[in-house]
Amino acid sequence: MKNLTDSFVYLGHWPSAGSFGFNTDILATNPINLSVVFGVLIFFGKGVLNDLLDNRKQRILNTIRNSEELREGAIQQLENARARLRKVETEADQFRVNGYSEIEREKLNLINSTYKTLKQLENYKNETILFEQQRTINQVRERVFQQALQGAIGTLNSCLSHELHLRTINANIGMFGTMKEITD
């Protein structure tokens, strides 16, 4: 039993210069395997992510176009309000004697309400853009994480064979037996 354990211990200590052998130190090989898996995922997943980002970009651009159309509608409303204001000013000249202060108050209310409407539309456009950007970023993060996790699981499943698993268990049992004999 001790010879079997020693043979596994010596497998892990083969000289690295000029030779090729099995690396049985699983903790040392996992970062290398993970870096290879991530490299492959990034290399092959780049096209998928670019397509996803292009789709999101188109949605954001469509949202911006819609917001611009709303803005143009607000500008049209502002022009209508200005035309109405000119009409009110004309009527104000006619009724100046009867109620100059009332007309001025209506004019200010009209300008303020139009300004508030325009500001609300601008805020809505900005909030929509921020929301779409954040949603796109979150979806891309989730998809990348899922693809990386699936790739890592697939790599781990393909690397572990039944025989290697049993040999590792037997070697560890042998080491624990040796440690128990030493402590007794």
UniProtKB/Swiss-Prot annotation:
Keywords of the record: ATP synthesis, CF(0), Chloroplast, Hydrogen ion transport, Ion transport, Membrane, Plastid, Thylakoid, Transmembrane, Transmembrane helix, Transport
One MF term in the entry's GO annotations: proton-transporting ATP synthase activity, rotational mechanism
Membrane topology: Single-pass membrane protein
UniProt main location, coarse: plastid
Residues annotated as signal peptide: none
Localization annotation: Plastid, Chloroplast thylakoid membrane
Gene Ontology CC: chloroplast thylakoid membrane; proton-transporting ATP synthase complex
TM segment ranges: 27-49
Extra remark beyond the main annotation: In plastids the F-type ATPase is also known as CF(1)CF(0).
Family, as annotated: Belongs to the ATPase B chain family.
Subunit architecture: F-type ATPases have 2 components, F(1) - the catalytic core - and F(0) - the membrane proton channel. F(1) has five subunits: alpha(3), beta(3), gamma(1), delta(1), epsilon(1). F(0) has four main subunits: a(1), b(1), b'(1) and c(10-14). The alpha and beta chains form an alternating ring which encloses part of the gamma chain. F(1) is attached to F(0) by a central stalk formed by the gamma and epsilon chains, while a peripheral stalk is formed by the delta, b and b' chains.
Function: F(1)F(0) ATP synthase produces ATP from ADP in the presence of a proton or sodium gradient. F-type ATPases consist of two structural domains, F(1) containing the extramembraneous catalytic core and F(0) containing the membrane proton channel, linked together by a central stalk and a peripheral stalk. During catalysis, ATP synthesis in the catalytic domain of F(1) is coupled via a rotary mechanism of the central stalk subunits to proton translocation.
Protein name, as recorded: ATP synthase subunit b, chloroplastic
Lineage: Eukaryota, Viridiplantae, Streptophyta, Embryophyta, Tracheophyta
Gene label: atpF
